[in-house]
Structure formats: C-alpha cells, structure tokens
A protein has these predicted regions:
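Substrate-binding pocket helix/loop in short-chain dehydrogenase/reductase
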Residues: 98-100, 104-112, 207
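Canonical Rossmann dinucleotide-binding motif of NAD(H)/NADP(H)-dependent dehydrogenases/reductases
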Residues: 4-37
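Active-site helix of classical SDR
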Residues: 123, 160, 168
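Residue(s) in the substrate-gating loop at a strand-loop-helix junction
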Residues: 144
Length: 285
C-alpha cells in the first residue's frame, strides 16, 4: 500500500498497539509519517514492535484500567516526540462471557474497567494535553457493532461498547470548542490474535456465512478507518461511529435468523472472542 505522508510530523498514542488492530494501525500511522507510543500490557510484544519500527516508535507498558499508566503513556509521547496529536483508545478484551446467570460480578467489573474506564482514562489525559497545546487533535475509540443495539451478543461486552459509543458522542460535543475531534470505530468480526484462541477454521466459516462481503475482516481494515479519522480528510467529522463490519450490521434481523437461534449465536460469539466451550471468564487481548 502506497504512502502519502498524510500524518507527517504527527504524534500518536495507540493503546493495545502491540497486536491485532492496534498493531496494524501503528504500522499504518508510521508508514504515513507519524511517531507512535505503543501502550500495551504485553511487554515482549511491545518491545518487539519498537525494535521493528525503531526511531518512530516508543513502547510504554500500560494497563488502560489504571489511570496512572495511561497518563504515563501520554507523557511518554510528549517527552519522546514533543507533542500529542492523535489518541487511539483501542486496548480491549473479550470480557465476561456466558449466560447472565453465570457471570461473576468481578468479571463484569473488570470488563468495564478495561473497555470503558480505559477509554475514559485515555480521553481525559489526551484531551488535557491537546487543550494545553492549543492545536486541536483527534481521539479515536474502538467500540463495536455489538454496542449499536440489543441482540444476542455477550452482555458485558455489548453494554460496555454501547457505553463507549455514548462516551464518544458526549466528549465530542464537549471538546469541539478546542478543535478536538472524538470519533469511534465499530468493528464487526475482525481476525485478530484474540480469535486465534478459538477455532480458526470455524471462524473462517462463520465469517463467510454471515457477512454480505465475502472477505475476512482484518486489522488493516480498522487501520484504514483510524488513519482517515486521524488525518485532515476527516477535519469536519466528530461525534460519529464508523462501522467497519463487512455488512453484518446492515443484515439486521436476517443475521439472527441465519444463525438459527441463541445456541448458534453463542457459538459465533465464542469463536469471535476465543472463548468457545469455556465458562464465563475474563480474557484480555
């Protein structure tokens, strides 16, 4: 893919940037001229990314549910590269999974701590820095098609992603006066390391059966959306959620009918989150 240098001179923090959609976005941002702080729990993977991309990337160990860690990642961007222009709140987890009667309260709370508080922490500290700089900026949050409406998805994950969409809209309204744009990306079934924990062949079958578009969702598809939201072509875009799902959400109720009911829907969700055949348990990306 050719580069246009659309992010030349920009500085970004990407949480969950050591794998999956985050890593694809880090590589795309760097290819377009940005410097990036990769904020991730996985030290080995994060250091590997920093070594691969050398001077353009700094790794910072970060648990997004811990505010001090996120604040440190923002400081790392300023200390290493002089500013912060883009914040991609992408770190996530499959979350508490299983029947509502079986989910443990602690697992529910952990899911929200990572998926919602993590976005809050990132938005808060990125906005503080961007306001201080006085030059605007772009904050991008990873939500999900599961957060767009009720359905048969995992309760904790779906509810948390709905909260991310709402948080995106409210903070976009608040921060617009500072020329800070806040948007969300709603992926569908994206083939990431999390999915590798499930049945890869089954995942391929599920995606080909359910998506109107006959292609596998890849991290690069999310990276493309993030690049657009981060760059000047989206200068008039804020408070919106971009759906990148191969058409799954447009299938509406037809999707549920094609799945054949709750049992198969649970199977699909299990594949997508690498939790097939397991009890309600928290699994981090």
């Amino acid at each position: 893919m050719s580069s246009t240098g659309v992010l030349k001179g920009a500085v970004a923090v990407v949480t969950g940037g050591a794998s999956g959609m985050g890593l694809a976005t880090v590589r795309r941002f760097v290819a377009e001229g940005a410097s990036v702080v990769v904020a991730d729990l996985n030290v080995e993977a994060g250091e590997r990314v920093a070594a691969e991309l050398e001077h353009a990337v700094r790794f910072e160990r970060c648990d997004v549910s811990v505010e001090a860690d996120v604040a440190a990642a923002v400081r790392a961007a300023v200390d290493s590269f002089g500013q912060l222009n883009i914040m991609f709140n992408n770190a996530g987890m499959g979350g508490a999974f299983g029947p509502i009667t079986e989910i443990e309260s602690d697992d529910w709370d952990t899911t929200f701590a990572v998926l919602v508080r993590g976005v809050f922490n990132g938005t808060k500290h990125a906005a503080r820095q961007m306001i201080e700089q006085g030059a605007g900026g772009s904050i991008i949050n990873t939500a999900s098609v599961a957060g767009l409406g009720g359905g048969g998805g995992p309760q904790a994950y779906s509810a948390a992603k709905a909260a991310v969409i709402n948080l995106t809209e409210t903070t976009a309204n608040e921060l617009a006066a500072h020329s800070i744009r806040v948007n969300a990306i709603c992926p569908g079934i994206i083939f990431t390391p999390l999915m590798h924990r499930g049945d890869e062949a089954d995942a391929e079958t599920v995606m080909s059966e359910l998506q109107p578009l006959p292609k596998r969702g890849e991290g690069s598809d999310i990276a493309g959306a993030a690049l657009w939201l981060a760059g000047p072509d989206a200068a008039f875009v804020t408070g919106t959620s971009i759906v990148v799902d191969g058409g799954i959400s447009s299938a509406g109720t037809r999707l549920y009918g094609r799945l054949g009911g709750t049992q198969n829907l649970d199977r699909v969700v299990g594949i997508a989150h690498g939790t097939t055949g397991q009890a309600a348990s928290v699994r981090r990306l």
